[in-house]
Amino acid sequence: MKFAVILLFSLVVLAVASESVEEVRREIDIEDLPEQQRGCADLRQPCTEGDDCSCCGSEGVCNCSHPHKKGCYCKTAGPLEKLAKKFRGCKNK
């Protein structure tokens, strides 16, 4: 019984690990696209500096001061950032 539980747990860990590797591959592919093609970026994806509207949805803003990443990436907006984005007239895509 213990062996079956350990085996099942190992399979779950392996599935989660392979999914995270696939996510990293997708992020790299998006970085290679020209700016026009990635104008609508998801959270944690590259965005256009100074253009919060390039982060789609009301939940994202463009952050260019990430301590561990070079460049600009969409991040989850705080309450004040969401209001500012709404008043800027960004169209949610």
Curated annotation (Swiss-Prot):
Domain of life of the native organism: Eukaryota
PTM comment text: Contains 5 disulfide bonds.
Keywords: Disulfide bond, Secreted, Signal, Toxin
UniProt main location, coarse: secreted
GO CC field: extracellular region
Localization, UniProt: Secreted
UniProt propeptide residues: 19-38
Protein biosynthesis found in the keyword field: no
Single GO term (MF): toxin activity
Expression (tissue specificity): Expressed by the venom gland.
Leader sequence segment: 1-18
UniProt record similarity statement: Belongs to the neurotoxin 31 family.
Protein name, entry field: U12-lycotoxin-Ls1b
